[in-house]
Structure formats: C-alpha cells, structure tokens
Swiss-Prot record:
It comes from the Bacteria. Belongs to the CinA family. This is Putative competence-damage inducible protein. It comes from Anoxybacillus flavithermus (strain DSM 21510 / WK1). Disulfide bonds: none annotated. NCBIfam families: cinA_nterm (TIGR00200), molyb_syn (TIGR00177), PncC_domain (TIGR00199), PRK00549.1 (NF001813).
C-alpha cells in the first residue's frame, strides 16, 4: 500500500497549530507495514482540496484525511469527497443519537448544523467516535481506500487505534505479524550512533533499523515481520543484542519510556529518595518528575533557588563561594546538592546551575552548566557545555541530571 495523509484546515497553513496528526498516523502506519510517501496540508477550500485529492489518487491507494468533519460551513471534507466520488451523504443513526444524547445530558441547546456531524458517505464503513461527535469513515472506490478522521488529536488517535487500524489490517489480508521495538539512547549523537552500527544499518533487511534524533536523544526503531509473532520478536532480540554490544553505555530504555520515568522506576527499585535544588532549570526537573504517577514515593522535595539570596539564605551556600566563584561554579553546585539533601532529609540531592541565555552570566558563556549529586558517600559534580536556545539548554540539563543519576544508581 502507498499511503498519503491529507490534513485539512487553514489553521495548519497559518501555523496556528502543529500537524501532530500526520506524525502519529505515519508512525502507526509504519508499524503495520504501510508506507507513507506524501504529507499534504490543504486549507478550508473545496477547490484546493479537490485538486489535492485528484493528485493523491493518482499516486496513492490509501488516502487518510484528518479534519473538516465538524458542523461549521468551513468543514468541507465529507462534502468535497462525496461530490468527487459521486456519493450521497446519509445520516448515521448511531452517531446522531449520540449527539442528541450529549446535548440532552449537558442541557445545552443544539444547533441545526450539528446534524451535519452525523452524516457519512454512502456505503462507507463507519468509525465510531467515542471521544467526540463526528464519526470517521472509510470506503474503497476504484481500488483506492479513503479514510476520513476527525481533526482533534484526542478524537482522532483513539478512533484510529480502535477502529481505523483494524480496518486497514483487515483490508491488507497480510498473514505476517509486524513487531516494532524502540531503543532509546542519551549522551550520544545521531551521527556517532550511526557510525557505531553502520554495518548493521547497511545490512538491514528484516528487521529494519530506523534512527531518529530528537531533543538531545536518539532512538532506533527496530521492525520485524514474520508469520509468527514470537519469531518476529526473536529477530528483533538478535539485532538488539548486536546493537547494545557496541553502544550499551548510552542505552536507557524502550518504546515510550523517558529518562524521567526510567529514573523514577530506578529510584523506587533502589528505595531511594531525591531532593532537588534548581537554579538554571527553575523547577523544570521537578515538573517532569512530579508529572509521573507515584512520584511522591521518591521525591522528598525541592527548592527553586533562582537568586543568590535564596541560594545563600535557604540552602546556605557560603557567601564566599558566590562572591569569588559565582553561582555558576562547581563549588556552588556541590554546596547546593549537599544542602538540599540535608534540608529534605533525602538519600540523594541533585543541583542544577548554569547559563541558559540569551546573555552570558558572571563572565561565563551561554550553555555553561554544572550539576551536583550528593549522597552519603560524597558529592560528584559534572560540567557541561550545551548548545541551543534557552528552553533546549534547560531541558537538556534536566535530562542530563536523570542520566547522571541513573549512572550513579546502577
């Protein structure tokens, strides 16, 4: 199957929202062995949408649309496709009843145009919307499969996973099982990682190896096909073993795992508590950690010590250090980590201090970072020189904190 994703909505062209739907769908289609060759974005204009469909059906046999299924006049996806394919729009009774029930339960008036959301293409396979009003739909015309999905990701993603993906798998009539596994790496660049496993990438057949760099991390997606799922997993195991034999020090987890979730799990496993002193990161590290369920079992507390006054008066960094070496220094990071550990009575204390930019600080350039980690066995400090904008430096600093803690805990 050759797939094309057409996102409909002027807000996408204006840059008001990001096209995360295309990213999600491309990932999901890759997992089931469907190749996506084109991404197209079209505004709320029936003529331009018609042209995009005419082009797409000449080069693709699966076209997935997102957006344009709402109740307003600029929601034209169904109407445009119906006209092109010479299909009528008919009322889906189940969807209509669901819409009526929603307005009845919420005691809100229903506009006449809400009925439009329950219309589907004649002869289509209806994809139920359990998180919104407008159903999706799929149909095959002249050997081209058209799938229409709502625009809001909170509606589109569960609809595709529960109804759209199974529909496509059934249409493909493929006996092979497709298994994917993502390996996650940190503290190694994409080019270095590819160099280390270049021969494996060059020789890939089944499984395939797909590298991707994002936010200071690198991932490898391994995908294998076999009639038996167990054999597909075994093929992936073999390739994973060969990869990790070369780059294991940089590997930290699988699939949707993050450095923060890995750290949380490891702290729980080791029965350790953590306290945090954040200057450079301004609470970002704790924000990421406490967003995870059960974080309270390992996070003892923290201090956002953005000013020297707080560093000195709350975390008792000696004035002499701040005056002679500055807040962005090894000794300051060491003192912050040790004293936040004492303050919160935790097993481990970690500190972050540095220069996020856009201007230099204390004569130190943007990207200068110090991290301190204090335990009962002593204190270690780590110096970094990072690049990127302010937010990138802060996030990478927080991730390096996770990385160094994981190294210590293992």
């Amino acid at each position: 199957m050759k797939a094309e994703i057409i996102a409909v909505g002027s807000e996408l062209l204006l840059g008001q929202i990001a096209n995360t739907n295309a990213q999600f769908l491309s990932q999901q289609l890759a997992e089931i062995g469907i190749d996506v060759y084109y991404h197209t974005v079209v505004g709320d204009n029936p003529q331009r949408l018609t042209h995009a469909i005419e082009v797409a059906k000449q080069r693709s046999n699966l076209i997935i649309f997102t957006g344009g299924l709402g109740p307003t006049k600029d929601d034209l996806t169904k109407e445009t496709i119906a006209k092109m394919l010479n299909k009528s729009l008919v009322l889906d009774e189940e969807a209509w009843q669901s819409i009526c029930d929603y307005f009845s339960k919420t005691n809100r008036p229903m506009s006449p145009n809400n009925r439009k959301q329950a219309l589907v293409l004649e002869g289509s396979h209806v994809l139920k919307n359990e998180h919104g009003m407008a159903p999706g739909m799929a149909l095959v015309v002249d050997q081209v499969t058209y799938m229409l999905l709502p625009g809001p990701p909170k509606e589109m993603q569960p609809m595709f996973m529960k109804y759209g993906r199974p529909f496509l798998l059934q249409k493909r009539h493929v006996r092979e099982k497709i298994v994917s596994r993502v390996l996650r790496f940190f503290h190694i660049g994409e080019s270095q990682l590819e160099t280390e496993i270049e021969d494996l990438i060059d020789a890939q057949t089944n499984p395939t190896i797909a590298p991707l760099a994002s936010d200071g991390e690198v991932t490898l997606r391994l995908t294998a096909k076999h009639e038996r799922e167990e054999e597909a997993k075994r093929l992936i195991d073999e390739v994973e073993e060969n990869i990790l034999a070369r780059v294991r020090p940089y590997f930290y987890g699988y699939n949707d795992e993050t450095l923060f979730s890995k750290l949380l799990a490891t702290l729980k496993e080791k029965h350790k508590t953590l306290a945090v002193a954040e200057s450079l990161t301004g609470g970002l590290f704790l924000k990421e950690m406490t967003a995870l369920p059960t974080a309270s079992s390992v996070i003892a507390g923290g201090v956002v010590c953005y000013t020297n006054e707080i560093k000195e008066n709350v975390l008792h960094v000696p004035k002499e250090i701040l005056q002679t070496e500055g807040a962005v220094s090894e000794r300051c990071a060491q003192s912050l980590a040790e004293n936040v550990r004492k303050l919160c009575r935790s097993d481990i204390g970690i500190s972050f201090t540095g220069v996020a930019g856009p201007d230099d600080l204390e004569g130190k350039p943007v990207g200068t970072v110090w991290i301190g980690i204090a335990t009962e066995r002593g204190t270690k400090t780590f110096a970094l020189t990072l690049s990127g904008d302010r937010q990138a430096i802060r996030m990478r600093t927080a991730k390096y904190g996770c990385y160094y803690l994981l190294q210590l805990l293992h």
